[in-house]
Each structure stands twice: as structure tokens, then as C-alpha cells.
Amino acid sequence: MILKKLKISTWSGDATNCYIVFDEETKETMVIDPAGDVDKIIEIIDILKGNVKYIYLTHCHGDHIGGVTELKEKKGGKIIIHRNDAEGLNDVNINLTHIIDMPEIHLEADSRIDDGDKLHLGNLEFNVIHTPGHTCGSSCLYCDTEKLLFSGDTLFRGTWGRTDLPTSNFRDIIDSITNKLMSLPDETIVYPGHGKSTMIKEEKPIYLELRKKDY
């Protein structure tokens, strides 16, 4: 497996992490949260000689989906998102493109996934983990063989995603992290939607403390 990370400047003013996952044997490629800078994304895909199979969206916010339409038009791939966020792709009041000074986005998902679904990329298997909180349909992707997690805006290094936005909920995000993500192996590397990577073992003390306080 080859993993590439791009920090993409967005209209929200906060760089979004876009990830390109490439299976070397089959050349199947997955792009996670193509927020923009599509030419840069395509440049990497072309260098790898990759074939885009999936465009995976961890949630529906504009700063994660800004490059989806152009990427799909140029490289193909199925647009995948959790079913609870699928409608938000086509609703500017939920994807927030009307308030973060970017062109309005209206998208349709090719596939609406659920908790426990699996995606196969060549020899790699990814488990879908529904993690409501930042949005009602936020999801993470976990690969057990590689011990890596793409956490979107659910889990960050030292903190969690915002819960003051449409369909977000503070208790839900804490429950998602505490009861689902913190049960993953300690050595799991976490690749978030913004900021630096971390590991599950580095984040556990925060959520153990929150559990004690009965959040």
C-alpha cells in the first residue's frame, strides 16, 4: 500500500487533509475527502498510474467535498458517503457551502454506506465505522492489516470535531470516539481531516478521563 497526504487550502481558511490510498498490485486507488486542488490530486494519481475506484467522503461539509465533481469527471470513481450524510451533499444548509464563502455544492452519492460495511481496494480491506457527532453521518475508515484509521472530523490530535453545526451533537461525538474508536488497537495510526496524525494510544487518556466525568 502507498499512502499520500495532501494539505488542501479551502474556503473555510483551514487546510483539509486529503488522502490518496493506492494498492500497488492492482493499481486501484481511493481518494478520501478531495477538498480541492484537483490538479495536484490527479498528478499524484497519474504518477502512480492509479485507477480511481472510490471517492470516499468522511462527511458532507464543503471543506471536504470541494473537488469531488471535478475529480469524478476527470478520473471516475464511485462517490461514497454514509447514508445519514448523503442528503447533506445536496443541501447547502447542511454542507455549509453557503456560509464558508465557496461556490454552492450539490452532489449525489453513488453509494450510501452503513456501519460495518466493508470496502475492498485490491488486497486491502477497510471497515466503515459510523461515528455520528460532527455530523449525523460522519464515518471513519479502518484498515486492520495496516492498523490505520481515517477519522475525518471526528477525532483529531488531542481533541475532537466541532459540534455546533447542523446535525452535530456533542454527546454523540464523545460516544462515537469513546465506544468505537478507542476500542481499536493502541498502535493504530489516526489520519484526521485536519492537522497532524496521532495514534489511538496517545488519545485514550483524554477519553478515559471524560468517561470518568460521565460526559
Where would I find each of the regions flagged by the language model?
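Short Pro/Gly-enriched beta-strand edge/turn motifs at strand-loop
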Residues: M1-K5, T97-D101, G122-L124
